[in-house]
Amino acid sequence: MANQNSDLYKQITAGSVAAVFQTTMTYPFEYLKTGLQLQPKGTAFEIILPQIKSYFVGCSALNVAAFGKTILRFVTFDKLCHSLNNNIDNNDNFQRLTGYNLLIAGTLTGIVESLFIIPFENIKTTLIQSAMIDHKKLEKNQPVVNAKATFHNMATKSTPVARIEKLLPAVKHMYQTRGPAAFVQGTTATIFRQIANTSIQFTAYTAFKRLLQARNDKASSVITGLATSFTLVAMTQPIDVVKTRMMSQNAKTEYKNTLNCMYRIFVQEGMATFWKGSIFRFMKVGISGGLTFTVYEQVSLLLGFSSRS
């Protein structure tokens, strides 16, 4: 039992280092993806191309989330593996799970992770939205609407986007202006995205793996990974766009709820808007897996345990 706990702590340490490293290295893609998703139709792309340092605005929030999420992931998944495994007589519970039970464990773990990171995602979105906007142009073009609100149009006075640059001031501003609800915006879309992510990734990976099973080489592994990432992004990007919009600083004045957000994006901006930022998300997803695995392997060796245990 002591050895199992020791290995779990080492896995958490290796996983945390890998998660923070991967989050930092791929964050510019996250910044550009989120920036594009927040931009209304017809807004110039140049607005979200600021100084290089701006590409890491909000990264601190995701790094804190990555650290906490990794701990939660290993502990939750370990507990679920024990609960779903009827034949626990060794330390290799993960490999002994059936495909169906593995999917359940992965999905439930993903939902728990998603609930944990929602506040940090909101902080990140607030910081990115502030950093990417030319506030002088925004103030000149800020619409003021006083007509009656309808399902098609949230006709309330537009809320200006605040200029915030750091983590703690962002938390303070969000609480003061929007209350505790500011940290749980986009919860519905986030949960649906996580369920879709886990299900599609598991299904797509299995399908491509079987399709290329005759080729047992590194090339087939790379192709499988890229094809899985492409399928995942293509099928879940609309949910990701809705999630980002619902986490924006002015979401309450723009949308009544998640369904209204989807409807208004479709009617006012067109179907193509649902795939905004997909190229940058694909780059992030495609790089993240290999980067995380490589760092995890190296840290595992330094800690003196097998990463496959």
UniProtKB/Swiss-Prot annotation:
Belongs to the mitochondrial carrier (TC 2.A.29) family. Pfam families: Mito_carr. GO terms for molecular function: citrate secondary active transmembrane transporter activity. It is found in: Mitochondrion inner membrane. The lineage of its organism: Eukaryota, Fungi, Dikarya, Ascomycota, Saccharomycotina. This is Uncharacterized mitochondrial carrier SCY_1795. The chain crosses the membrane at residues 12-32, 47-67, 100-120, 184-204, 222-242, 285-305. Its main location: mitochondrion. The keyword Translocase does not apply. InterPro entries: Mit_carrier, Mitochondrial_sb/sol_carrier, Mt_carrier_dom_sf, TXTP-like. Keywords: Membrane, Mitochondrion, Mitochondrion inner membrane, Repeat, Transmembrane, Transmembrane helix, Transport.
